[in-house]
Amino acid sequence: MTKNNQSISYKDAGVDIDAGNALVEAIKPIAKATARPEVSTSLGGFGALFELPMDKYKNPLLVSGTDGVGTKLRLAIESGKHDQVGIDLVAMCVNDLIVQGAEPLFFLDYYATGKLDIYTARDVVAGIGEGCQQSGCALIGGETAEMPGMYPDGDYDLAGFCVGIVEKADLIDGTKVKAGDVLLGLASSGPHSNGYSLIRKIIEVNGANLNEECDGQPLIDALMAPTRIYVKSILALMKQIEIHAISHITGGGLLENLPRVMPNNTKAKVDTKSWNRPAVFDWIQTHGNVEFHEMHRTLNCGIGMVVVVDEKDQQAAIDALTAQGEVVSVIGKIESSESETPEVDLV
């Protein structure tokens, strides 16, 4: 029994069920706009149903992935820019699937906060919906967790989960990579969703003005540009040529992500002057006095995805990707190496 016979509600404890229900209603149209024919449920149920398109596949493989946005969220929270980090969340997941040739099918999100702000959450989910539309996958469910005492006021965290499908014979796993193959770099929109702990430290040390101009726009806009989603461009390319490997350039940069899709005894020789690096990376390197090696093992430095193709398919691949709106640069080649483990040589 409480003192003075006071009745304590869940809302008194910091959890507003009505706010949660209102959010579900607010995001139903967002989810509906992403629907695919295979989806047979709507938001609000205990589980989401998705009928696999078995008539399109002989031997399908399901490919799954999960990711977050990292400390880019801190910049979003501090700047009040919540409408694009949802795109980042989807991008980080679906870009990981497409490197294996998998078409994203459906996506789920997890939104955790200390006190639910319906408007902030709705903006975030609207971005998730936009990311799902860009990648052609359905937003079929999620979880909103209001956990008083776990997060400071105004803070939230995100996680995303995605499942895709690929014909087993079409799986892209890097085993076909060989000396002489060409590295095609697809331009990024900025830092994407990696390296923000470094970026935030540089902002702090410099006392940077986030409204200062960077390549014709406020610095904060350059830093918060949503991660580019490459799914539809890669799916279109797969129909035209054989892709030997794809690497999503995330945390670890070119130095650590290219070897993940290369066989032993190979080296990727990359010309770092072969593409136009966005000005935001110049700002980061200059204001942080960041060394060359550190830049390329922390940030994508202007290349968000690398596609490895046979030399004979180079121009066809460039034409196909350009037709999809990608900015493509020939950034290097695969060479033979005496090292048993894959190497990257940046010049």
UniProtKB/Swiss-Prot annotation:
UniProt-annotated location(s): Cytoplasm
GO cellular component, one term: cytosol
InterPro entries reported in the protein's UniProt record: PurM-like_C_dom, PurM-like_C_sf, PurM-like_N, PurM-like_N_sf, PurM_cligase
Pathway: Purine metabolism; IMP biosynthesis via de novo pathway; 5-amino-1-(5-phospho-D-ribosyl)imidazole from N(2)-formyl-N(1)-(5-phospho-D-ribosyl)glycinamide: step 2/2
Enzyme class: ligase
Keyword Cytoplasm among record annotations: yes
GO biological process terms, semicolon-separated: 'de novo' IMP biosynthetic process; adenine biosynthetic process
Primary residence: cytoplasm
EC number annotated for this UniProt entry: 6.3.3.1
CDD domains on file: PurM
Top-level taxon: Bacteria
Entry's Gene Ontology molecular function annotations: ATP binding; phosphoribosylamine-glycine ligase activity; phosphoribosylformylglycinamidine cyclo-ligase activity
Keyword entries, A-Z: ATP-binding, Cytoplasm, Ligase, Nucleotide-binding, Purine biosynthesis
Gene3D superfamilies assigned: PurM-like C-terminal domain, PurM-like, N-terminal domain
Catalyzed reactions: 2-formamido-N(1)-(5-O-phospho-beta-D-ribosyl)acetamidine + ATP = 5-amino-1-(5-phospho-beta-D-ribosyl)imidazole + ADP + phosphate + H(+)
One Pfam family per UniProt: AIRS_C
Family: Belongs to the AIR synthase family.
Annotated protein name in UniProt: Phosphoribosylformylglycinamidine cyclo-ligase
Lineage: Bacteria, Pseudomonadati, Pseudomonadota, Gammaproteobacteria, Thiotrichales
